[in-house]
Amino acid sequence: MFTPCSFSVALPALKAGEILCLACGADDVPAGASRAIAVVRPEDLPANALPVGTVLGAESGALLKIEGRAFWPGWERALFLARVLADISSGVRILKTARAGCALAVVTLSDKGFAGLREDESGPALVDMVRKGLPLCHERRFLLPDEPARLRALVLELAGQGYDLVISTGGTGLSPRDLTPEALIPVLDRRLPGFEQVMMAASLEKTPRAVLSRALAGTVGKTLLFALPGSRRAALENLEVVLEAVPHALEKLGGDMSDCGRK
């Protein structure tokens, strides 16, 4: 569950559209860093206070939006990457955090797509479906080859950045390169068999070949994860039947303690 906070930071002059790096817990900035970097004292910023999609604002309105994080070579601390939403003059400001909606990442796994030999149709379609069913504060798409290690590393990084919902498409069949379940099951904290069963049932209504699907659902920390088939049609059919339950699942992952039973 997102907890708003406020902190003081000295900002350089910035133009809308630029990227600002926020460094937490540093006495100085990495050698060679550009001017677009600001330092926040660790005591001013609670842990996990800046998940992706967080908006930082002042009295004048929204100024920055967290879009990710990066690591400077040879420097241990993560840098938060913030998109500048409005022109900013240099000076010290009290920034307040706010976050409305969920952060979505869609990862398409396709050797041919990654090589530029096939257009990704599933990824954009999945984003559109989620956008129609959920309010989003941030969205991003990724395209990877069918390489388990790269997928596993990306999913762990996305969960660490605070993405609420991560959906992969591709690699759930029986071909030699279909290794998405093998990549993701080891990093799941919990499998969600109910979601998996509903997706399988919906697919079997369309074709008996759906028995070959190894689509899965689970959690990585507070991130909800779905691994869907690579076919655009199959991926959308799977997502459609579970999307209604996603908001409730995200609330529970965020710490909602209310009863789940219907009255």
Where are these regions (language model features)?
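N-terminal accessory interaction module
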Residues: M1-T97
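Internal alpha/beta core interface subdomains
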Residues: V29-A31, D87, G91-V92, R99-A103, ...
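Glycine-rich phosphate/diphosphate-binding loop of Rossmann-like nucleotide-binding domains
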Residues: R93-D146
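Short coil/turn connectors at secondary-structure junctions
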Residues: G101-L104, Q161-Y163, V220-T223
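Short beta-strand segments
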Residues: V107-L109, S168-T169, A227-P229
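A general structural motif
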Residues: R118-D120, P145-R152, L204-A210
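N-terminal small/polar loop signature for handling phosphorylated ligands or for N-terminal nucleophile
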Residues: D128-S168, G173-V187
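Proline/glycine-rich low-complexity loops and linkers
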Residues: T180-K263
